[in-house]
């Protein structure tokens, strides 16, 4: 199953809850790849965003993720420009992941960082070792 199909396979199980089945092809050993775990949590959080863009994500990988999982989103705070949402992913063995997402509205800025030139830096051979000399 490809990524897009897996993301679309989620089923609403409550107001802010979704269930997914993670096939073995998405496993690395006994758990699911971390990026997929984070993406499933984000998928459950998106309906709480109010159309705002994702601005930050913090994900704690608590336990193995495999088979059937349920992601439940909780709206922590909604302001004029930002939304904070937590997601708990539960699997067959209990809590699998906890995530907090911040969504924010686009804001115009007088600052433009798009085309800044790269700074001048020394080559790695000319830079002092951070760890000291190696044996």
Positions of predicted regions on the chain:
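Terminal targeting signals and extreme-terminal segments of soluble enzymes
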Residues: 1-135
